[in-house]
Amino acid sequence: MNILEKETEMKTIGMVIAIDEELKAFLKKFDYVKNVKAGAYDAFECGVADKKVFAVKTGAGELCAAAATQFLITAFGAELVINAGVCGNLSKNLKILDTVVVKEVVHYQYDTSAVDNCAVGKYEQFESVNIPSDAIFREKLRSAFPFVKEARCASGDKFIAEKEDKEYLVRQFGAEICEMESAGIIITCKKNRVPCLIVKSVSDDCDDMDFMTYVEKAAAIVSDIVIKTMAML
C-alpha cells in the first residue's frame, strides 16, 4: 500500500510557505515552534494536536517551491504536504479574503506544443492539463469548513497584474485563482506519491495595491483554517 492509499492518521506534515507574511501567521498559532537547521533550509518544527509539522519558507516561484517540497519529503518523511497562503482572484464568484481549497492546478507556463502539439500546460504523465489534488484531504477540510469553495488554480512564475493576463487564464484554462508555487508543489508530490493539500485565501483581484493591503489579513484567515484542519487529520 502506498502513502496515497493510507487511511491512517497523518503524524508528520510538511508545510511549504512562500513569503514572510504567510509564515508569521502560522508560527503564531502552533502549539510549539522550534528552529531546525537542515541542509540549506532554516526549517521550523511545529506542533498541532498530536501532529509534528515541519515548515519552510521557500520564497516565491515554482522551482523554489518544488525544491522545498522534495526537501520536506526527503529530510523529514512528510506524509502529507500542505501549501497554504494567499492568491490572486480570477473569478466573479470570489472576493478578497475568501478562502478556497485547490481542486486542480494548471501550470500555464509549461508549453511543449512546438514539438509535440500538446495543449499548453499538458504534462505527458497526467491525463489533463488540470492536475488534481487529493480529494480525501479536500473533503476533510470542507466537512469542517463548508464555506470554503473548491477552485482551479493557474500557477506560474509571474505575478498576474495585467487585465490581459487575467483574461487569458480564465479563457484558456477556466482558472479561478492564480499564484506562483502550486504547480511545483503538486508535481513534486505526485512524483513521490505523497498527498498534497493546497489552501489559499484571496489577497487581491490581481492588483499589486490590493495585495499589499490585504496580504496579512488573508494569511491570518487561511492559517486559522489550516491549523484546525491539521488537528483533525
Give, region by region, the residue ranges found by the protein language model.
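Short, Lys/Arg-enriched N-terminal segments with co-localized hydrophobic residues
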Residues: 1-9
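A C-terminal functional module that forms or caps the active site or interfaces directly
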Residues: 158-208
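Mid-sequence, gly/pro-rich, charge-dense loop/helix-turn segments that line enzyme active sites
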Residues: 89-173
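Alpha-helix C-terminal capping segments
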Residues: 71-75, 93-94, 186-195
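N-terminal short beta-loop-beta anion/metal-coordinating cradle
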Residues: 10-70
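Regulatory input/activation interfaces that engage signals or partners
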Residues: 194-196, 201-233
